[in-house]
Structure formats: C-alpha cells, structure tokens
Amino acid sequence: MDLNCLDFEQPILKIESKIHSLMKLIHHDKKLAINIYEKINHLKQKSVELTQKIFSNLSAWQIAQLARHPYRPYTLDYIAYIFDDFDELSGDRVYGDDKAIVGGIGRLNSRPVMVIGHQKGRDIQEKIRRNFGMSAPEGYRKALRLMKLAERFNLPIFTFIDTPGAYPGIGAEKRGQSIAIAKNLRAMTTLNIPIICTVIGEGGSGGALAISVGDKINMLQYSIYSVISPEGCASILWKNVQKAPLAAEVMGITAHRLKQLKLIDTVIPEPLGGAHRDIVSTSISIKTQLLLDLVELDALQEEKLLTRRYQKFMNYGYC
C-alpha cells in the first residue's frame, strides 16, 4: 500500500502493481512473454476502466484530496514545461525573500512574461523551507514588486495559485499580513496589463486571492478554490472536523461548481487520474488555455481591459 496514494486510488494502484510485477517477470524470462503480455494488456484495460469509473463520480471532498495530492505538480513544475528561459527574482526589498512564493521573468512562445506562483515543496526539508506554500507578508510584497515591474515593461502576468492560505503566525501578523494582501488586491485591479490566473491545486482564502485578481481566472479540473478549508469550515459550523466532507460539498469548492456560479472563467481538463499522472499532458492543456486567454486580452485597449476586470469582480455574487 502506497501511503502517498489516496484511499480511492488504492484499487487502481493494486492493478498497476500487478502490471509492474508481470513486466519484471518478462525481463527475467523472455519465454513467458507472449502469455504474460496478454495478461498485461487485460490488466491495463481493467485499470483504465476502473479509473474512469472512480473519477467520473468523485465527491467534492475527494477532489479536495486530489488538489492536495503529494505527487501533484507545483508551480515550478509547470514553469519548467510551459515557459522558456525562466529567471527567478527574489526579495521584497523591505524584509526578506519568502520561498512560499516564486516569481520571475520567462518566455511564453518567445514572448517575455512575468510568472508568479505559490510553491509548497516536495520533501520535508523543502516543505519547511517554503512553509508548505503559506506565504508571509514578504511573499505578497515580492509578488507585488514583480507585478509592478511587469507593468513597467509591459509584460503580461501569469499567476499560479496553490496554497492552503496565508501564513497565520504571529510574526506574519506583526509584519503586516493583512495589509500586504489588501495592497495586492488593490494594485491588481489597476495594473494596465493582462493578468491571467490559474488555480493548480488549493486556492485557500486570502492567501490565494492575493495573487488571483485577474482578467481571466482558470482552474484545473481537480483543484479547489474557497474562503476557508473544508476542515476549518467544519470546525466552525459543527465543532467537528470529521464533517469536512459535508462542508466541502456545501461550500461549492470545485472547479465545475465555481464555473456554474460564474466565479471562474475556464475549467482546464486534467488527464485521467489527475495532473500527477501526466504532467506533460496537463502542461500542454494549461499552456493552450493561457495562449487563448492572452490572444483575447491583447485585443483589448487599456481602458476596456481595466473596466472589464473591475466589472468581473463587482459581479461576484450575482448569478
């Protein structure tokens, strides 16, 4: 049993484990190849059918678990596949450099752009260094500095959202967490360049919103976006964290539900089984959508761009 796999993935993993064992057997005894290949093909078909069955009926809570999957690609993973010549920029020029947010200049199909996103970290050491993707004020100030730099040089901004929320520690509060987020919200409404935001995992509360005020808001199929985590909501409403699955359902945190509510623009499809199963395919889907969005926004004059962005967020809550 793979402890990094989710409960509903385990039946699929068992079949894939059998396939892997049979492949090793072929490697050791070529004479068995013909019979074993038939068995492998049968198991592969069974795996696809089972995966389709499971993933066609996921609950909101299961999607939330997928959004947090240990193997799910992060911002730097997508940057490597989508952008060329990425050059990371560091520091807020006030306090320090927050590793929970990464950003820098890259090229999208040879066009210079600014890329900013949350980065959670893969192993324990990196998770600690990046504070599990929970940014402190200096992270949001860094993001704002890069956004203003992008405006100065007329670079489109692409943001990738993947955070449980802004860091709630005492130090962060003392250094101005709330005002750092507020300044980002205010600034992003007035930047006179295209801003395209994509939720790739968790979109948690103000920590997500601080870099997701844009002209286009996209979500990967198995990502989530909410004012509070399902566990947090359950703890407040029912005083019981075990009610998190119910909270996830009631809150409407999934991409398709948020699309219905007109809170996001596009749901980007993921490969069968989720983004962690095929990062290349997922990256192609994201890049395709980013290019489509950019073509649309490039056609707008500055005044129209800003007016449309303002109206977009003023219409939140009116379905």
UniProtKB/Swiss-Prot annotation:
EC number(s) recorded for this UniProt protein: 2.1.3.15
Gene3D superfamilies registered for this protein in UniProt: 2-enoyl-CoA Hydratase, Chain A, domain 1 (3.90.226.10)
Pathway of action: Lipid metabolism; malonyl-CoA biosynthesis; malonyl-CoA from acetyl-CoA: step 1/1
Cellular compartment(s): Cytoplasm
One Gene Ontology term from the biological process aspect of the record: malonyl-CoA biosynthetic process
Family designation: Belongs to the AccA family.
HAMAP family linked to this entry: AcetylCoA_CT_alpha
PANTHER family named among the record's database cross-references: ACETYL-COENZYME A CARBOXYLASE CARBOXYL TRANSFERASE SUBUNIT ALPHA, ACETYL-COENZYME A CARBOXYLASE CARBOXYL TRANSFERASE SUBUNIT ALPHA, CHLOROPLASTIC
Function: Component of the acetyl coenzyme A carboxylase (ACC) complex. First, biotin carboxylase catalyzes the carboxylation of biotin on its carrier protein (BCCP) and then the CO(2) group is transferred by the carboxyltransferase to acetyl-CoA to form malonyl-CoA.
Protein name, as recorded: Acetyl-coenzyme A carboxylase carboxyl transferase subunit alpha
Lineage, uppermost ranks: Bacteria, Pseudomonadati, Pseudomonadota, Gammaproteobacteria, Enterobacterales
